[in-house]
């Protein structure tokens, strides 16, 4: 599978023993849609099965779909609707429910679904059948859809919008998404990333089976288990999903097993899109001032430091690594939720959620990895973030990672210091208020403006001296200005970067503000791409 061809869309288990006669009574706690044989299930056995599976050669279960499904358009795929009369927990009459996605287009891997009675640890498979779906608006002749094709994924609903608006979606490979209070999907998470930026082709593991614990009528949390499989790894996952009024919180227990040596293992990966923003205008020749699902990578390092790294749409792939030990959290953030910043009434970038990872086990040494790919539009995800352990992963290794995911407008935690409000860049070398027109600077320079607010900046005594501390990996910085910004109750720091060589290597910039010995802000980190020497000139 190729990353750019992966569609972005809105195991046979070992025998666990026979079922006693008394177990038949437990069937009433299993979903009515489940029609398979009763079998035993618990998470410990799933973990053992995944580890055993890693000791065997990988066998792909990708199927050849009939042309009527393989050649569907996205409109046809979206028009095939799951029938809410056959929802997984319709007979529970509770707060939660599950619908399934039909296979089709690029979603060729059959995903098997099971209903679980958590009291008796018994499961039954939900088999694919025509009457689970409505085909009328799709133009698909269901008589040409034959066999037990499995499902492509599932979506979760919570009262009061059961069967109306889903709040969580698992669809394709190990991708999944959730909404926040704005009810708008945005960036995605994945179960595992393998070799996203390595010498060999990236590998996309699949969730091949899911088990859903049947909830009590008054339950408000989903409990879902998953088996992950790929040529290089297997995994057993437990998802505790709490769909709150303003956010979705997932607690994940991931047990990962390596089939082969893995050059680059990505834990808790997330995927997003950044085309253009306040600091990056190369691809913004549209009516929209900004186009992105996320605008920054935010990190709360193990040593307590907060870092803001604005995202880029580079001309060529760029990989950045931020070393850390036991990180407190990191995530991709959509910090600006003002409609005026996007002017978008179709996909509503102003309503996109942020995604924050909070480790709840010791992750040890490693790095937060950031991959930024070039994109010419808004339909391809070009941002990938994940945790990479420092210790090389060898065949036979087993690892356990526990973490929470917060899908919310902004992360659930923030620095008590001032935060980066916005980053801007443009022509430098002139005094503000004398923008070039009939006159141009003699020396080429690039100007950066970084706005800070919060953290008590608006309460600093008048006349407080504020000092920006800036470092760059090459070139030099000059012409600093610090401006009060009453509209955001903060300050703007501007400076010019001037080259000192012909190098076009990325410039790594780092800045924070302080007064005396007191640090006032989080750390701003930025990667700037200087133009070629022959382009460093004005008319």
From Swiss-Prot:
Molecular function GO terms recorded: carbohydrate binding; catalytic activity
PTM text: Predicted to be exported by the Tat system. The position of the signal peptide cleavage has not been experimentally proven.
Main location per the UniProt record: periplasm
Pathway named in the protein's UniProt entry: Glycan metabolism; osmoregulated periplasmic glucan (OPG) biosynthesis
Organism superkingdom: Bacteria
InterPro entries per UniProt: Gal_mutarotase_sf_dom (IPR011013), GH-type_carb-bd (IPR014718), Glucan_biosyn_MdoD (IPR023724), Glucan_biosyn_MdoG/MdoD (IPR014438), Glucan_biosyn_MdoG_C (IPR007444), Ig-like_fold (IPR013783), Ig_E-set (IPR014756), TAT_signal (IPR006311)
One of the protein's GO biological processes: beta-glucan biosynthetic process
Any one GO cellular component localisation term in the record: outer membrane-bounded periplasmic space
Subcellular location(s) of the protein: Periplasm
Keyword annotations from UniProtKB, A to Z: Periplasm, Signal
Signal peptide (UniProt feature, chain positions): 1-29
Function of the protein: Probably involved in the control of the structural glucose backbone of osmoregulated periplasmic glucans (OPGs).
Alphabetized HAMAP family for the sequence: MdoD_OpgD (MF_01068)
Family affiliation: Belongs to the OpgD/OpgG family.
Listed name of the protein: Glucans biosynthesis protein D
Source organism of the structure: Pseudomonas savastanoi pv. phaseolicola (strain 1448A / Race 6)
């Amino acid at each position: 599978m190729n990353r750019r061809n992966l569609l972005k869309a809105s195991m046979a288990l070992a025998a666990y023993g026979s079922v006693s006669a008394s177990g038949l009574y437990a069937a009433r706690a299993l979903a009515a849609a489940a029609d398979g044989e009763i079998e035993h299930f618990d998470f410990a056995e799933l973990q053992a099965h995944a580890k055993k599976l890693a000791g065997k050669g990988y066998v792909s279960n990708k199927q050849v779909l009939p042309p009527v499904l393989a050649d569907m358009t996205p409109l046809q795929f979206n028009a095939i609707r799951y029938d809410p009369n056959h929802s997984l927990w319709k007979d529970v009459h509770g707060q939660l429910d599950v619908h399934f996605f039909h296979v089709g287009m690029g979603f060729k891997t059959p995903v098997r679904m099971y209903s679980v009675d958590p009291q008796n640890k018994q499961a039954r498979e939900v088999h694919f059948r025509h009457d689970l779906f409505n085909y009328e608006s799709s133009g698909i002749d269901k008589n040409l859809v034959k066999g037990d094709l499995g499902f492509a994924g599932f979506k979760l609903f919570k009262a009061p919008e059961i069967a109306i608006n889903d709040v969580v979606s698992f669809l394709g490979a190990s991708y999944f998404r959730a909404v926040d209070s704005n009810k708008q999907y945005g960036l995605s998470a994945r179960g595992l990333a393998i070799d996203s930026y390595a010498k060999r082709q990236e590998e996309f593991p699949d969730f091949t089976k899911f088990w859903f614990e049947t909830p009590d009528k008054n339950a408000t949390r989903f409990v879902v288990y998953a088996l992950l499989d790929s040529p290089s790894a297997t995994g057993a996952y437990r998802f505790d999903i709490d769909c709150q009024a303003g956010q979705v919180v997932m607690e994940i227990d991931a047990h990962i097993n390596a089939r082969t040596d893995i050059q680059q293992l990505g834990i808790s990966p997330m995927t997003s899109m950044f085309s253009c923003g306040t600091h990056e205008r190369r691809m913004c020749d549209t009516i929209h001032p900004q186009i992105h699902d996320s605008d920054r990578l935010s990190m709360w390092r193990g040593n307590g430091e907060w870092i803001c790294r604005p995202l880029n749409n580079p001309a060529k792939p760029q990989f950045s690594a931020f070393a850390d030990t036991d990180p407190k959290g990191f995530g991709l953030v959509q910090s600006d939720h003002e409609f005026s910043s996007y002017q978008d009434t179709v996909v509503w970038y102003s309503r996109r959620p942020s995604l924050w990872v909070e480790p709840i086990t010791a992750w040890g040494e490693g790095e937060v990895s950031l991959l930024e790919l070039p994109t010419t539009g808004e339909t391809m995800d070009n941002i990938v973030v994940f945790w990479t352990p420092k210790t090389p992963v060898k065949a036979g290794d087993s690892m356990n990672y526990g973490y929470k995911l917060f899908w919310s407008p902004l992360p659930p935690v923030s620095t008590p210091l001032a935060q980066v409000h916005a980053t801007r860049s443009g022509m430098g070398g002139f005094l503000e208020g004398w923008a070039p027109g009939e006159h141009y600077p003699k020396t080429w320079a690039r100007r950066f403006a970084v706005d800070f607010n919060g953290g008590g900046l608006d309460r600093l005594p008048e006349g407080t001296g504020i000092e920006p501390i800036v470092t760059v990996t090459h070139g030099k910085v000059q012409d600093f200005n610090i401006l009060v910004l009453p509209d955001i109750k903060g300050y703007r720091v501007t400076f010019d970067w001037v080259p000192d060589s012909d190098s076009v290597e990325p410039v790594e910039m780092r800045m924070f503000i302080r007064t005396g010995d007191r640090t006032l802000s989080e750390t701003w980190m930025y990667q700037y791409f200087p133009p070629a020497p022959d382009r460093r000139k004005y008319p």
